[in-house]
Amino acid sequence: MSDILKNDWKNYLQSEFQKDYYINLRKFLINEYNSKTIYPNMYDLFNALHFTPYNKVKVVILGQDPYHGPGQAHGLSFSVNPGVKTPPSLINIYKELHTDLGCYIPNNGYLRKWADQGVLLLNTVLTVRAGEANSHKNKGWEEFTNEVIKVLNKKETPIVFILWGNNAISKTDFITNPKHLIIKSVHPSPLSASRGFFGSKPFSKTNNFLISTNQEPIDWQIENI
């Protein structure tokens, strides 16, 4: 795993792989992958970083932990592979996107188009046991993703941090650079979306901020496939 980062993230995160917490996390993960069903596939663990290089990040959408159903998680928060049914949280994201910007609700949940435009789709924890949400909480991933947020905080180019739910909001303390914008709300899960996610307009707020800082807005429309 220590040489898994193939792009410019390597320059910022390579030293993490030598730290005690990560060595312990790696041992834990080797045992978990060998003895249980773990999502995502181990080769997809760092897809968020691979699909969105450090120098391209304009927006961060921070999730909790990966989807824990068969075939769903592929390393991007909230996204599922083509052919997999769109999960309820993402359906709610699409509903808000429709209300906010008029985007139609697509027939798939594959968010690679966002990642390719500079939207880092990161979970606070990058692995999960099948059928057990939060089963890899407090095993070391939080420390790793804290570091991701810290190095992004140092960027001179303004970034929008979209924090949905308490796990994501807990990262607020690491975002201290006044150039960046933080957008917070409850999680888009059906359990909480009606308590402040719907109507929060995160997508138009993000694009307005990007335009105001002379950056290209995001084309949020995921097309049918």
UniProtKB/Swiss-Prot annotation:
Enzyme kind, highest EC tier: hydrolase
Functional summary from the UniProt entry: Excises uracil residues from the DNA which can arise as a result of misincorporation of dUMP residues by DNA polymerase or due to deamination of cytosine.
Pfam families the record matches: UDG
Gene: ung
GO biological process, one term: base-excision repair, AP site formation via deaminated base removal
InterPro entries found in the cross-reference section: UDG_fam1, Ura-DNA_Glyclase_AS, Uracil-DNA_glycosylase-like, Uracil-DNA_glycosylase-like_sf
Name under which the protein is recorded: Uracil-DNA glycosylase
Protein's organism: Clostridium beijerinckii (strain ATCC 51743 / NCIMB 8052)
Keywords, in A-Z order: Cytoplasm, DNA damage, DNA repair, Hydrolase
GO cellular component: cytoplasm
Active site: D65
Entry's localization field: Cytoplasm
One Gene Ontology MF term: uracil DNA N-glycosylase activity
Catalytic activity of the protein: Hydrolyzes single-stranded DNA or mismatched double-stranded DNA and polynucleotides, releasing free uracil
Organism superkingdom: Bacteria
Chief location category: cytoplasm
EC number: 3.2.2.27
Annotated PROSITE patterns: U_DNA_GLYCOSYLASE
Sequence similarity: Belongs to the uracil-DNA glycosylase (UDG) superfamily. UNG family.
